Amino acid sequence: QKPDSFLMAEIYEEARYREYLQMGKMDALYHKVGLYDTLRDIICYGHSSDRIDFVQEPLRDIAPQMLHFLENHDEQRIASEGFAGEARYGLPAMTLTAHLSEAAVMLYFGQEVGEPAREHAGFAMPTRTSIFDYIGVPAHQGWVNGKRYDGGGLTPEQASLRDFYCRLLRLPIKGNFQNIHRYNREHTSYYNDKVYSFVREEKQRKWIIIVNFSREDTFGFDLQIPPVLR
């Protein structure tokens, strides 16, 4: 009756992803088990960026139907003490998850201004914005600014973060994914598993995306593009 409806499912059994898409007729699935969990482990525990390939490669045929995110109503806020501790530490992962494929990306309200969810709401505990309690979202309220919606209540850091998100999500990045991470791991001096790189290619336009997950270190290397992509 409503052909424009969009059906999204939470399913945490990777072996059943295609079943939900093909038989269940879902339009998209949360990419929680796999990409979100991997990126969280990289951010929080310094796990190897090589793991990204292991979770993405088996899903290439359904990648456009996997919904990417770093925050939602269930998960801890990036800026919370239970996750990264500061919103800026999530920016490399957000850059990657927003443009890794043709998949849609979800931005949870308040994420773009670094909401840390420190409030003791009652039923829910800090680190998550409660969906069970009547509770404010202070960073988001700073953007609302008394219904003026001009960001007048944001700190300079929050305003800068929001500007980053606005610019990131407006980038017209499209096209096929090309993995150059593995090639550089094998052929490039000083390239390591704290960074990740890939190419998005559409007709004559190529986007080269490189992210550095390390909180402390920067790395100098000459990124190489495989001959087949030149």
In which residue ranges do the predicted regions lie?
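Acidic/aromatic-lined carbohydrate-recognition and catalytic surfaces
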Residues: 1-15, 208, 212
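Substrate-binding cleft/loops of secretory-pathway carbohydrate-active enzymes
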Residues: 8-44, 116-126
